[in-house]
Amino acid sequence: MSLSVVISTKKIDKEFISILEKSSGVYKIEILPYENNGEHSLTEIYNMGLKDSTNEIVLFCHDDIKFDTKNWGRKLLNHFKKSDYGIIGVAGCRYLPTSAKWWELPPEMMGQVYHENEGKRWLSTYNRKFGSDILPAVLVDGLFFGINKNRIKESFDESIPGFHFYDLGFCVQNYLKGVKIGVISNIDITHLSMGQTNQEWEQNRINFSKRYKDSLPLLESIKFKELKFKKNKPLVSIIIPVYNYGKTLDTALTSVFDQTYQNLEIIIIDDGSTDPFTKLKLDNLDIPNTKIIRQKNGGPSNARNEGVKICSGEYILPLDSDDIMLPTYVEECVNTILRDKTISPVYCDTIHEGEMKGVEKRPEWSKERLIQGPFIVNCSMFSKEAFDSIGGFDESLKGWEDYDFWLRMMQKGYIGKRIAKPLFVYFHHEKEGTVSTIANQNMSELHKKILVKNKLIKDIPAYQPLKNNNSGFNIFT
């Protein structure tokens, strides 16, 4: 198996062609440079390349890139040889909205591309490296993409003029006919110029959106591997409430499937989402060991309670759809909670991301400290037995329901245990006005209300809320 490379360029650069030949690692590679100063659209040039190329595998790439990976051609050929993909690139996305702006939702973008411009070099990274795997996509960027001529269904759409949307047009028309499209991460490319969204780009976008209005949006879901269950290990139920945060759900789910402890069931509660993307995401989920429940909006406490009602796990771990766990978190929680039946919850230190950044060391658990104020992360493990003993989360509370939950667990004789490691990542969205953000603005009032509810304040008039400490994270000192 050999490789053909098609390039559209204003002036044929023999040095660039030599670099292609030497760096590819492919014997008798075929280079097809087409000199083009605007006489032809890119779709016309690329169709010429499809016709003129003698090899089954054809690479289309810009003439302003550097190949940072040795034997990149051999790697590309190997991807096609070991898979049934028809189109493969180094950057792309799983979601194409009706606007045709494929970068609208960064969590759905994939790949890594270096950029070099005006003496500066930087890496645009949309997800971490994933070895020699191929991640399914709905389209790939035209910077660098290979095709198998025997697997594609359509050539380039010559009704698209100029140099924009040739890649989207080619990918989408093939994707809609069942051609598999994917992104790889083991070939590094440096782009030596910046993309432009000029008037031609905008007109092509409008035309593209109109043409495919009945097909957009498009979404390709992540394929997760089966969890590997071990005998004589307790089952842990991961409860994930979702309300209009589908854009981060894949990241949260990836952190679940990356766990070293695999005896897991996943329960996703769609709490009445109204966001079109979230509904599309949930409609397209196909995940092993997972139950998806749709319900009217009832709030976080109701969603967690409904999840626990149908779970089979001996232990429960709530996870918000915009947060993630580090790979050993569940395993370390299970190892801790198995030491003593009275342990609930198990919690850890926290990595903060978003509008607040840093690592927060959580206090050690004690009754006195817990009464002072909340410090246990909402993504903490507890036993189903402990949950049942207190009747679950209080659905009447609008904020700090987890704090009330831990207090009632304490009053039933359960004790908390801290894992002194940052194994949980909490993302802040203060500007978006989430329930937790609004609750924290009224923390003194909520604190007092919850203590009164649980009969933990003896002298109400003497109650004084504690001030924030200097960490910027712990609410109470």
Question: Can you name each region flagged by the protein language model?
Answer:
Residues V6-E44, M48-D52, L253-R294:
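Acidic donor-binding segment of Leloir-type glycosyltransferases
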Residues N198-F224, K421-P422, Y426-H429, V435-Y463:
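Catalytic core of nucleotide-sugar-dependent glycosyltransferases
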Residues E39, K66, K70-V113, T328-V359:
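Conserved donor NDP-sugar-binding/catalytic core segment of glycosyltransferases
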Residues M1-S4, P234-V236:
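Extreme N-terminal starter segment of soluble prokaryotic enzymes
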Residues K120-G146, P363-M381:
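A recurrent flexible, glycine/aromatic-enriched loop bordering the glycosyltransferase active site
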Residues D323, V452-T477:
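Membrane-proximal basic amphipathic "stem/tether" segments
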Residues K231-N442, N469-N470:
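Nucleotide-sugar donor-binding/catalytic module of glycosyltransferases
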Residues L76, V138-I147, R151, I160-I187, ...:
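A short, conserved alpha-helix in the catalytic core of glycosyltransferases
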